[in-house]
Amino acid sequence: MENERKYSIKVEVRTIYLPDQSDPEAERYVFAYTITINNTGSVASQLVSRHWIITSGDGVTREVRGLGVVGEQPLLKPGETFEYTSGTAISSIAGSMKGSYQMVAEDGFHFSVEIPEFILSVPRVLH
């Protein structure tokens, strides 16, 4: 329980469909997602890598792994927040993403932050 308070990262996600970058005829739907990462723990921690599982509504799944996020490996002191925007394309009007961040605390402790599944969905258009 003590480690949960010591190494605590909160993740919030907002998504938006990007119609200008999408091509429905080619089954390409592009979304931007903005992620806010807040260190709610008591130890400074650095985001060192990410792992995403991206699933289209048609069942196509792909995994993405890499160092940091948007070219950075942010170090978050207790109470600090880091926000970034990135994007992805899927082959259907709806899908989802989930994943994790791998973190290293300033005391050398390695831990993973789960990113709960969130929905990517083209808004309905009323005529």
Curated annotation (Swiss-Prot):
Example of a GO biological process term: error-free translesion synthesis
Lineage top rank: taxon: Bacteria
HAMAP family reported in the protein's UniProt record: ApaG (MF_00791)
SUPFAM superfamilies linked: ApaG-like
Name of the protein in question: Protein ApaG
Segments forming domain ApaG: 3-127
Listed InterPro entries: ApaG_domain, ApaG_sf, Uncharacterised_ApaG
Organismal lineage: Bacteria, Pseudomonadati, Pseudomonadota, Betaproteobacteria, Nitrosomonadales
